[in-house]
């Protein structure tokens, strides 16, 4: 019970993720087969659909945009300021901050991670490990999107008796960039709105919000 309580946030979103993927697989299969019947093409079973490039491409489109959002957000909040937002550092804390405030090197505590106590490349990798992980996930999922999107695009071309293209050509194809950019703009809108909304709006008890009674121009504070 203690484990569930201490990890309830990650478990909650993990369950939502699995549930959403299952729901998407059935809804997507229904739509795919409906389109196939309209064009007098063969339909898919559920298993064939979830292992297809059509389903994989749709999933990766969403994943890569989420990882891009957080990669840019993590990096931009190091150097950029939004006055009054709980999502921004205070003006005096912008930048990489001091070793003392970051508890690294000789300022590390007894229970600090070992690499925070180290120096050189190990510390550099660890103090940038979050942005490195998010960036790796973004490029990995974007690469997977391109492969699945390319295969799905060529499958559609063959169904319509039209010429196929190479994977390299697909990177310059409007289909690839339409799929990418329509996801990116929604992520930029959401994260930008969050930064501005937290200036004036509150959610009692949430670490994503300032305390209810905090001034609108108070920057870099949260519950």
Task: Place the predicted regions along the sequence by residue.
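Extramembrane terminal tails and long inter-domain/linker segments of multi-pass membrane proteins
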Residues: 1, 44, 85-121, 205-223
């Amino acid at each position: 019970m203690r484990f569930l309580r201490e990890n309830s946030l990650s478990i909650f979103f993990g369950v939502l993720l699995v549930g959403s993927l299952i729901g998407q697989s059935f809804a997507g299969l229904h739509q795919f087969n409906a389109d196939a019947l309209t064009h007098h093409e063969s339909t898919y079973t559920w298993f064939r659909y979830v292992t297809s490039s059509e389903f994989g491409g749709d999933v990766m489109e969403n994943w890569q945009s989420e990882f891009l959002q957080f990669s840019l957000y993590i990096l931009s909040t190091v150097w950029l300021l939004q006055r009054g937002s709980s999502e921004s550092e205070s003006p005096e804390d912008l930048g990489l901050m001091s070793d003392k405030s970051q508890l690294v090197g000789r300022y590390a505590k007894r229970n600090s991670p070992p690499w925070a106590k180290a120096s050189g490349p190990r510390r550099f990798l660890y103090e940038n490990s979050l942005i490195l992980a998010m960036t790796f996930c973004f490029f990995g999922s974007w690469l997977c999107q391109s492969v699945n999107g390319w295969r799905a695009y060529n499958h559609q071309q063959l169904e319509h008796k039209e010429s196929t293209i190479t994977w390299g050509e697909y990177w310059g194809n409007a289909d690839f960039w339409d799929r990418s950019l329509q996801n990116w703009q929604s992520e930029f809108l959401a994260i930008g709105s969050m930064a501005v909304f937290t200036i004036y709006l509150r959610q009692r008890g949430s670490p994503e919000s300032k305390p209810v009674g905090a001034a609108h121009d108070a920057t870099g504070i949260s519950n």
